Amino acid sequence: MAGRSGDSDEELLKTVRLIKFLYQSNPPPNPEGTRQARRNRRRRWRERQRQIRKISGWILSTYLGRSAEPVPLQLPPLERLNLDCSEDCGTSGTQGVGSPEILVESPAVLEPGTKE
């Protein structure tokens, strides 16, 4: 469950509980009061949320040795990607996506020099 060798599941769960507690300790602001009071409460709430995000990132990097940001997914080169409908077409709701059966010619309206 932890995803890295050396990390115990219990340590990960304890860290997640701590971060969850931090977020639960800062509920959304009360929507009552004057416009200025609501604006001030939202501003203070957003600042606390930013602090909680920073603290959560620090906790993850310090206790688990990983960053709060996800690791970017490595994609294959575009040259290796293709649309091939020769295998099992239509099972995922994409029937006819790769078949070039219908040819559409550009309409004469878009040709240069024609006016209505």
Swiss-Prot record:
Gene3D superfamilies linked to this entry: 6.10.140.630
InterPro entries, A to Z: REV_protein
Amino acid composition bias (Basic residues), ranges on this chain: 36-48
Domain comment, as recorded: The RNA-binding motif binds to the RRE, a 240 bp stem-and-loop structure present in incompletely spliced viral pre-mRNAs. This region also contains the NLS which mediates nuclear localization via KPNB1 binding and, when the N-terminal sequence is present, nucleolar targeting. These overlapping functions prevent Rev bound to RRE from undesirable return to the nucleus. When Rev binds the RRE, the NLS becomes masked while the NES remains accessible. The leucine-rich NES mediates binding to human XPO1.
Official protein name in the record: Protein Rev
Other comment: The OYI isolate was taken from the blood of a healthy Gabonese individual.
Protein's cellular compartments: Host nucleus, Host nucleolus; Host cytoplasm
Top-rank lineage group of the source organism: Viruses
GO molecular function, a single term: RNA binding
Record PTM Phosphoserine, positions in chain: 5, 8, 92, 99
Location of the motif Nuclear export signal and binding to XPO1: 73-84
Functional description taken from the UniProt entry: Escorts unspliced or incompletely spliced viral pre-mRNAs (late transcripts) out of the nucleus of infected cells. These pre-mRNAs carry a recognition sequence called Rev responsive element (RRE) located in the env gene, that is not present in fully spliced viral mRNAs (early transcripts). This function is essential since most viral proteins are translated from unspliced or partially spliced pre-mRNAs which cannot exit the nucleus by the pathway used by fully processed cellular mRNAs. Rev itself is translated from a fully spliced mRNA that readily exits the nucleus.
BP-aspect Gene Ontology terms: mRNA transport; viral process
Keyword set includes Transport: yes
